[in-house]
Amino acid sequence: MISLGLILFSSVLCHVATAGRTCPKPDDIPFATVVPLKTFYDPGEQIAYTCQPGYVFRGLTRRFTCPLTGVWPTNTVRCIPRVCPFAGILENGAVRYTTFEYPNTISFACNTGFYLNGSSSAKCTEEGKWSVDLPVCTRVTCPPPSVPKFATLSVFKPLATNNSLYGNKAVFECLPHYAMFGNDTITCTAHGNWTTLPECREVKCPFPSRPDNGFVNYPAKQILYYKDKAMYGCHDTYTLDGPEVVECNKFGNWSAQPSCKASCKLSVKKATVLYQGERVKLQEKFKDGMLHGQKVSFYCKNKEKKCSYTEDAECIDGTIEIPKCFKEHSSLAFWKTDASDVKPC
């Protein structure tokens, strides 16, 4: 007959053998939750992994049972982001992105001359869909430009709607007697407006003054306006210093103030000089004197080196300074060689 003590001892051994060890809290998986979540589990208890919204399950199984060994089986659970479909091609624009995965955001931008019609960004949602549809890039247009006062449109080619596209230009002209301040050309900008309009202002100039030893002709009218012209001239033996024709400019001044400069009488009777790169006889080429602004080069001797060099002389309003190194060759001293005939240094 089996004793009661032996029976109790056997039952304790059996319980220890079948109870096993408890399992610890399972590994944390990014973007996943465990149900039920406890600090330890008895052998035979089950857990299940669930992915958070926006993520999908990858692995062999999502359910695990705590074994008698107290060690969880190898866990291959992964929760990966949902991937939204290709966003599409934005015509006349660009889609900027790093990835199409949840919860990333993509942005939209239009090329210069187009504006965004729709949202500037879209987010990949938990369902793997984009939060908004692909926008549209619409071409920028400008309304008909305003015409400045006292101006006319000289160049303008609008659309059939009378609007203009980005980059289109309009060119203005001022009415007679009016000068333009600012750029005569305006451009339709990427913002749908025109660049700054110019301004047309009436401009008057004083009557031009007559130069000494000369004359000036201009239109016979009471007032001289912008773009009116005057013509200058000089008396005999005087040379005009400045343009022959001047114009009333936009600032109410004449474009130049010409003057009449006197010719130069030459004290040298005989010399060979350089004029515009050619050797000429001074007494023949300039028998009536040199005009203001004319320049010649006189030949001089370098006695030490026995060679010649040139120095310039210019007629300036009736005055010319003959180089000091120049020595006029006398016809009586026929045995002497003129500096112009000596080899150059």
Swiss-Prot record:
Molecular functions (GO terms): heparin binding; identical protein binding; lipoprotein lipase activator activity; phospholipid binding
Residues carrying a glycan: 33, 117, 162, 183, 193, 253
Pfam family, one: Sushi
BP-aspect Gene Ontology terms: blood coagulation, intrinsic pathway; negative regulation of angiogenesis; negative regulation of blood coagulation; negative regulation of endothelial cell migration; negative regulation of endothelial cell proliferation; negative regulation of fibrinolysis; negative regulation of myeloid cell apoptotic process; negative regulation of smooth muscle cell apoptotic process
Predominant subcellular localization, coarse grouping: secreted
Signal peptide, first to last residue: 1-19
Any coiled-coil regions, as ranges: none
Sushi domain boundaries: 21-81, 82-139, 140-202, 203-262
Positions of region (Sushi-like): 263-345
Job description of the protein: Binds to various kinds of negatively charged substances such as heparin, phospholipids, and dextran sulfate. May prevent activation of the intrinsic blood coagulation cascade by binding to phospholipids on the surface of damaged cells.
Protein name: Beta-2-glycoprotein 1
